A protein has these predicted regions:
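Class I S-adenosyl-L-methionine-dependent methyltransferase catalytic core
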Residues: 1-202
């Protein structure tokens, strides 16, 4: 994910700060890792069709703030007091390492949304990066006949003229529309990623 994100930022020469959005965020792991590894992320937006996953993502993305790290450390300290497990002690050490990586608080907005329908974004993101459902989940939960194409259409409507989109997917999946121009494609085993920029309209 990090390498893909950096390829996206390279398309914005001179840009110092980015708003990043994942419309299929799951537990928010991709965005949380990106937030710790890239100090040019100023704001994160994340959504998923599952309320349960949105709740997990909100908790993970909160670690990108000192307040969130403090809260998690308090939880772990209480678990250590109750159970004394070595795994909890290791988690506290990991948390302290994360604190050292955090240069500034990263604001995050996490919400439930079906990315094949109209997305309630207050602002257009600079970079959209997502690892889309695949396998038995290819029809997703929206009931859309072709959820992948519907997602691309909705993201085009939520984007600004310079927005860059990176999609990680099964290598058999492909984009069939004309709202996005593909800039890059790479296959890695059974998966691939493609990077796009919004097509210019006359």
């Amino acid at each position: 994910g990090n390498e893909i994100y950096r390829r996206c930022t390279a398309l914005f020469p001179g840009r110092k700060s980015f708003t990043v959005y994942d419309p299929c965020c799951g537990g928010g792991y991709l965005l949380t890792v990106l937030g710790f590894c890239n100090h040019n992320i100023g704001r994160i937006m994340a959504s998923d069709v599952s309320d349960r996953m949105v709740s997990v993502a909100a908790k993970n993305l909160a670690l990108l703030t000192l307040q969130g790290l403090d809260g998690r450390e308090r939880e772990l300290t209480e678990l250590i007091r109750q159970y004394g497990k070595s795994s909890h002690l290791e988690a506290v050490e990991s948390l302290r390492r994360l604190r050292n990586r955090l240069v500034r608080n990263v604001e995050s907005t996490v919400f439930t949304a079906d990315c094949t329908q109209t997305l309630p974004l207050a602002d257009a993101p600079d970079i959209i990066i997502t690892d889309v459902p695949y396998g038995n989940l290819v029809s997703w939960e929206s009931g859309e006949k072709d959820s992948l194409q519907a997602m691309y259409r909705q993201l085009a409507m939520a984007a600004h003229s310079g927005t860059v989109l990176a999609v990680i997917m099964d290598k058999r999946q492909r984009y069939k529309g004309d709202s996005w121009n593909r800039l890059e494609r790479q296959v890695i085993g059974k998966r691939k990623f493609e990077i796009y920029r919004l097509a210019k309209t006359d």
